[in-house]
């Protein structure tokens, strides 16, 4: 089974949390709302977090606070466009982050993004991993 380590920034700005909607044809959770992240081979954890934020959310999003919050694991099944499926062991390293602004420019991994009040998070089609993370945080 392949292993994948994910750095998940839980980004808050003035009581709103950043969610990104995965592109319908990508990732383990296509078309669902999620938190970004991923670690490349040889990369340090915080370097990976900052790179992922830059690549997936743009250069203009300014984080004023980054702190490790928790980690967890599970397994997910990824379905490829040809119908092939793969079980992946996922390790999630979750960070509390505060942004100074909401200036986001998503890349091709996402179809949309939203800054969401805590009480409205339940109204989004969250992927299973994000739902667990937000529940652990007491936001769902």
Curated annotation (Swiss-Prot):
Catalyzed chemical reaction(s): a ribonucleoside 5'-triphosphate + H2O = a ribonucleoside 5'-phosphate + diphosphate + H(+); a 2'-deoxyribonucleoside 5'-triphosphate + H2O = a 2'-deoxyribonucleoside 5'-phosphate + diphosphate + H(+); dUTP + H2O = dUMP + diphosphate + H(+); dTTP + H2O = dTMP + diphosphate + H(+)
Record keyword Magnesium present: yes
UniProt keywords, alphabetically: Hydrolase, Magnesium
Keyword Magnesium listed: yes
PROSITE patterns assigned to the protein according to its UniProt record, in alphabetical order: NUDIX, NUDIX_BOX
Domain of life of the native organism: Bacteria
EC number: 3.6.1.9, 3.6.1.12, 3.6.1.-, 3.6.1.23
Span of domain Nudix hydrolase: 1-140
Pfam families: NUDIX
Cofactor requirements of the protein: Mg(2+)
Protein purpose: Catalyzes the hydrolysis of nucleoside triphosphates, with a preference for pyrimidine deoxynucleoside triphosphates (dUTP, dTTP and dCTP).
Subunit-structure text: Monomer.
Family named by the database record: Belongs to the Nudix hydrolase family. NudI subfamily.
Name this polypeptide is given: Nucleoside triphosphatase NudI
Lineage summary: Bacteria, Pseudomonadati, Pseudomonadota, Gammaproteobacteria, Enterobacterales
């Amino acid at each position: 089974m392949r292993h994948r380590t994910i750095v998940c920034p839980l980004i808050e700005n003035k009581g709103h949390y950043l969610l990104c909607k995965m592109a319908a044809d990508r990732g383990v959770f296509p078309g669902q709302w999620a938190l970004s992240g991923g670690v490349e081979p040889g990369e340090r954890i915080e370097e990976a977090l900052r790179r992922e934020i830059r690549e997936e959310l743009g250069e203009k999003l300014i984080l004023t606070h980054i702190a490790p919050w928790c980690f967890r694991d599970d397994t997910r099944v990824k379905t490829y466009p040809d119908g092939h499926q793969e079980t992946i062991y996922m390790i999630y390293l979750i960070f509390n982050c505060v942004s100074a602004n909401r200036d986001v420019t998503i890349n091709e991994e996402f179809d949309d993004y939203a800054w969401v009040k805590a009480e409205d998070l339940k109204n989004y089609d969250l992927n299973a991993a994000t739902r667990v993370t937000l529940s652990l945080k007491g936001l769902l």
